[in-house]
């Protein structure tokens, strides 16, 4: 509802990460969608949101090279002020090749390697935003919680990640791999480490950033889909 094009696009980007990080080859997506009444009191807004959502899904999916093979759509007054954009992702991986989102038992002394889009201030507060009751008067202030999508970079990252996984399997290297979702670096690093009873030292000055003078708490907690 806040920025429907970007919101839908990053929804696709997020679900692709979830499946990719398990070591799977992504093969398709699908989208069950719920919108408000296109003939009701908010019909103009509903139609605008629906069009932007569809364009966002198509724009990200086409650029990243993953086909959308299905979904469904329903319209109801209950979704006038808060649409629902569900995203499904299908991937294929052999059970023995599944990669987990926690550090292996032998990971003492391992480095944490962060790959992807340079960190900026977009997506900061995304986890809290996801739990908010949306209010139209807060629309502008909520924009910063939604990331700016870059599906062409995501396409490159997916292919590079496939290559990393293949090389790790060939060399017998055990690793943990996790997408950097809401909460950014702080969330993903703590989850990867704590699940295996490890701690980690995080030097934020070594994080690649695209904006000058970002406060440490922004670097630590911002999020993008790439």
Where are each of the predicted segments found?
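Glycine/proline-enriched, intrinsically flexible loops and inter-domain linkers
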Residues: 1-226
